[in-house]
């Protein structure tokens, strides 16, 4: 695999997003807890696995978790040699998510190399065939692809997240798309079909699109398209049934079970439905701000060779098919986003390398490209700044652990209610039981919770006052509030309005204040401090003992 400085920048940006937002949310919980259990208990003793206590509505595949756990194992081995004492395993969580980010990042780089190899091969052939004629050059196509990626908040932020769409699914679909660009159509159909049945069934729409348009463009026969699709589905089914039936202790094929429950039975619609056009009118616009890449797609498609057209049409087919599912989420079509960027990169490379700079309009047109990337990057950083404040459960757990360590508290039980568990609490964040003896209870059943309530020494909950806690005599206070955790809840426009609409000021004087009087750094700090609203959402309580009450 060829490597460039920009490849390193891509991985660095992905890592930066990870460090800025180290916690996870409920959508990521299955994979992160499964990876924790595999690393902690091994695959041979599943009796203590979290999914047996909290199985969820339908089974989910363990295949991705097993792969990521295997790739993370060397870190555990090295850390055991160093023998450093760590209060929690949050560092392991960061490594695990870093491995997920690495698989996604390397797949983007591989796809970039496939794009560039395709254009380099085409250019060489044209040079041999037309020695005396000018030909279009696309030497920067791969570079533009990476630049568009780096400015994409959704791909950079979520590349390290243990959402099922990003744990092996997106990396392998990127490889499949790369194989199409290299002319390996049968292999691409085989791999994408395997990914669909093992990891995410919606990828079957992308796989079908690759097969359909490979046949339409006469790259393979219909027989081969069907044959390799069946081979992929067959091998993937065998892998999933073998692995997942073991972990779930019953025969299952999770992606089929999920399809029957969510799509056939219609339970996914309970999470909300949107119009057929929503992916095109809302989600794609949300993922491409400003919409330069989308605008370049029309131009890029006209210039694209057949291989790239197959990739782009297959991705469009994927989005269209998913549009008929009433419940929509941006991550369901994330596998099509790299293809959109491939076309955008093709259009950008053509303009950048082949447009003659003779008119002012041409200069302005070319200037839009780097300006657009800079704008996307700044928008992405703004989204990151806000998004990192949306994991208060993880912050609350960290503050609780710090208190336990600082005050040398041992052998206690803390109950964590559902909302904190959904916004950052994971098994990796728990203190080492052998050292501190802290039990982290997450019981959801009301009857069991009432029975266990007297045994809790601490609570991390969403209830703002002790009088609102369940199973308590409202006239007697048994709990002391020891900590609160804030979360981003909105914007206050007062500061920016007062700054912009000062008396007797114009644009130049405002810029002077920002650049010279305050400096941009100070202005941004003041802007964020005065405009971003954070409110208390989680509350940590300590049980008041009888002797403390008397005192």
From Swiss-Prot:
Membrane side Lumenal: residue ranges: 1-2, 83-89, 158-178, 224-227, 297-303, 353-365, 439-551
UniProt KW Cytoplasm keyword: no
Main location, first listed in the record: endoplasmic reticulum
Compartments (UniProt record): Endoplasmic reticulum membrane
Pathway as given in its UniProt record: Protein modification; protein glycosylation
One Pfam family from the record: Glyco_transf_22
EC numbers for this chain: 2.4.1.260
Enzymatic reactions: an alpha-D-Man-(1->2)-alpha-D-Man-(1->2)-alpha-D-Man-(1->3)-[alpha-D-Man-(1->2)-alpha-D-Man-(1->3)-alpha-D-Man-(1->6)]-beta-D-Man-(1->4)-beta-D-GlcNAc-(1->4)-alpha-D-GlcNAc-diphospho-di-trans,poly-cis-dolichol + a di-trans,poly-cis-dolichyl beta-D-mannosyl phosphate = an alpha-D-Man-(1->2)-alpha-D-Man-(1->2)-alpha-D-Man-(1->3)-[alpha-D-Man-(1->2)-alpha-D-Man-(1->3)-[alpha-D-Man-(1->6)]-alpha-D-Man-(1->6)]-beta-D-Man-(1->4)-beta-D-GlcNAc-(1->4)-alpha-D-GlcNAc-diphospho-di-trans,poly-cis-dolichol + a di-trans,poly-cis-dolichyl phosphate + H(+)
Transmembrane segments: 3-23, 62-82, 90-110, 137-157, 179-199, 203-223, 228-248, 276-296, 304-324, 332-352, 366-386, 418-438
InterPro entries: GPI_mannosylTrfase
An example molecular function term from Gene Ontology annotations: alpha-1,6-mannosyltransferase activity
GO cellular component: endoplasmic reticulum; endoplasmic reticulum membrane
Entry keyword set: Endoplasmic reticulum, Glycosyltransferase, Membrane, Transferase, Transmembrane, Transmembrane helix
Membrane topology: Multi-pass membrane protein
Cytoplasmic domain ranges by topology: 24-61, 111-136, 200-202, 249-275, 325-331, 387-417
An individual GO BP term: dolichol-linked oligosaccharide biosynthetic process
Enzyme class: transferase
Function of the protein: Mannosyltransferase that operates in the biosynthetic pathway of dolichol-linked oligosaccharides, the glycan precursors employed in protein asparagine (N)-glycosylation. The assembly of dolichol-linked oligosaccharides begins on the cytosolic side of the endoplasmic reticulum membrane and finishes in its lumen. The sequential addition of sugars to dolichol pyrophosphate produces dolichol-linked oligosaccharides containing fourteen sugars, including two GlcNAcs, nine mannoses and three glucoses.
Misc. remarks from the entry: Present with 3550 molecules/cell in log phase SD medium.
Family: Belongs to the glycosyltransferase 22 family.
Protein name according to UniProt: Dol-P-Man:Man(7)GlcNAc(2)-PP-Dol alpha-1,6-mannosyltransferase
């Amino acid at each position: 695999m060829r490597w460039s400085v920009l490849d390193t920048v891509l991985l660095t940006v992905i890592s930066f997003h990870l460090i800025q937002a180290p916690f996870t949310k409920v959508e990521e919980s299955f994979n992160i807890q499964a990876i924790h259990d595999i690393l902690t208990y091994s695959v041979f003793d599943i009796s203590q696995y979290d999914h047996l206590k909290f199985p969820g509505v339908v089974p989910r595949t363990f295949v991705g978790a097993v792969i990521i756990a295997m790739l993370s194992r060397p870190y555990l081995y090295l850390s055991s040699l160093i023998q450093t004492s760590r209060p929690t395993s949050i560092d392991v969580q960061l490594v695990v998510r870093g491995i997920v980010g690495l698989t996604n990042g390397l797949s983007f780089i591989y796809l970039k190399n496939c794009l560039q190899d395709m254009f380099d091969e085409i250019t060489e052939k044209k040079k041999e065939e037309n020695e005396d004629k000018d030909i279009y050059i696309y030497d920067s196509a791969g570079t533009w692809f990476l630049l568009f990626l780096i400015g994409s908040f959704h791909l950079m932020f979520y590349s390290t997240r243990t959402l099922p769409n990003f744990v092996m699914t997106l990396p392998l679909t990127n490889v499949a798309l790369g194989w199409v660009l290299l002319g390996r159509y049968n292999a691409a159909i085989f791999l994408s079909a395997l990914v669909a049945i093992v990891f995410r069934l919606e990828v079957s729409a992308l796989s079908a699109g690759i097969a359909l348009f490979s046949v339409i463009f006469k790259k393979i026969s219909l027989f081969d398209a069907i044959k390799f699709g069946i081979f992929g589905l067959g091998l993937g089914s065998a892998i999933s049934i073998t692995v997942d039936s073991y972990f779930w202790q019953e025969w299952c094929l999770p992606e089929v079970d999920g399809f029957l429950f969510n799509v056939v039975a219609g339970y996914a619609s309970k999470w909300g439905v949107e119009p057929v056009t929503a992916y095109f009118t809302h989600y794609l616009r949300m993922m491409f701000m400003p919409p330069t890449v989308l605008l370049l797609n029309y131009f890029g498609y006209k210039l694209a060779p057949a291989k790239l057209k197959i990739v782009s049409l297959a991705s469009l087919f994927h989005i269209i098919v998913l549009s008929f599912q009433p419940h929509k989420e941006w991550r369901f079509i994330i596998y099509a986003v790299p293809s959109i960027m491939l076309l955008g990169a093709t259009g950008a490379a053509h303009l950048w390398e082949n447009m003659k700079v003779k008119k002012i309009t041409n200069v302005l047109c070319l200037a839009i490209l780097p300006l657009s990337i800079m704008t996307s990057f700044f928008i992405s950083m703004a989204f990151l700044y806000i998004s990192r404040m949306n994991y208060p459960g993880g912050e609350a757990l960290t503050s609780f652990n710090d208190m336990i360590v600082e005050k040398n508290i041992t052998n206690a039980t803390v109950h964590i209610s559902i909302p904190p568990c959904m916004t950052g609490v994971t098994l990796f964040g728990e203190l080492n039981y052998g050292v501190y003896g802290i039990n982290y209870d997450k019981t959801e059943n009301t009857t069991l919770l009432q029975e266990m309530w007297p045994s809790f020494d601490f609570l991390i909950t969403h209830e703002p006052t002790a009088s609102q806690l369940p199973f308590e005599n409202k006239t007697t206070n048994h709990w002391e509030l020891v900590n609160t955790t804030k979360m981003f809840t909105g914007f206050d426009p007062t500061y920016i309005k007062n700054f912009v609409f000062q008396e007797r000021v114009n644009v130049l004087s405002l810029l002077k204040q920002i650049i010279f009087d305050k400096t941009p750094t100070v202005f941004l700090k003041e802007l964020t401090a005065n405009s971003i609203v954070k409110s208390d959402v989680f509350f940590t309580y300590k049980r008041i003992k009888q002797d403390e009450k008397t005192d």
